[in-house]
Amino acid sequence: MPTLAFLLDVDNTLLANDDVKKDFDEHLQVELGPTLTRRFWDIYEQVRHEESVVDIPLSLKRLREQVPLPELDEQTYLHVHSIFDNYPFVNKLYPYVFETLAYLKTLGTTVVVSDGDLIFQAEKIVNSHLADAVGGRVLIYTHKQERIDDIMKNYPADHYVMIDDKPQILVDSRRIMGNKLTVVFVKQGKYSLEKFPDGFIPDITVPHISDVRNITAEQFLAVKQGK
């Protein structure tokens, strides 16, 4: 049978990132109050727009630079920083994530391929034990669909399966990899109702990441085999 490599996203694919953000907001409201909390999220969105990626460390840095000490003393700022540094990400993994990764490991190579700021995403993946679950096979890029060649070079396989919640990433990756890639759309999180562009239809759609356990190797390979 051809060798398989599974390229797994993190945010809203393996981990309920929308819920994480709600938790952050609740903690920030306690530490900062409503005005500075809104200020932080405004900075967060500004950074996301400028960098085309979420960057928590840069957002925190700008918060410190833009808010004077009388409004945000250093101790409070350090408490805010610790909210992000010490968050128990493992508690926000979707049900049966580890079982799903263990199942996929019986079919091929499992690789976490995430995008975002390199520091915060790395902490998230390690602290949630996802890195351990895939044997340390973790790649983080600012925009992973722009690094397909690097992904394939690091983890060569006859066929690839990308499991992701973001329609545009799946479309872009298929455009690059063609029939060497099976795309699996996981309908979780804020992109779950987003339509695919140009009538694109994912090869496989599942409502929950745990449903991936019901897919056989033959089904993952069906696109390559022209079925």
List the model feature ranges, each with a label:
Residues 1-2, 126, 130-162, 166-227:
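Asp-based, Mg2+/Mn2+-dependent phosphohydrolase catalytic module
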Residues 9-10, 15, 113, 163, ...:
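Short hydrophobic segments within beta-strands
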Residues 98-111, 115-139:
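Substrate-recognition/cap helix-loop segment adjacent to the acidic, metal-dependent catalytic center
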Residues 20, 34, 45-85:
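A metal-dependent, Asp-based hydrolase signature
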Residues 82-112, 145:
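Short, acidic loop-to-helix structural element flanking the phosphoryl-transfer center
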Residues 13, 118-119, 168, 191:
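Conserved Rossmann-like nucleotide-cofactor binding loop
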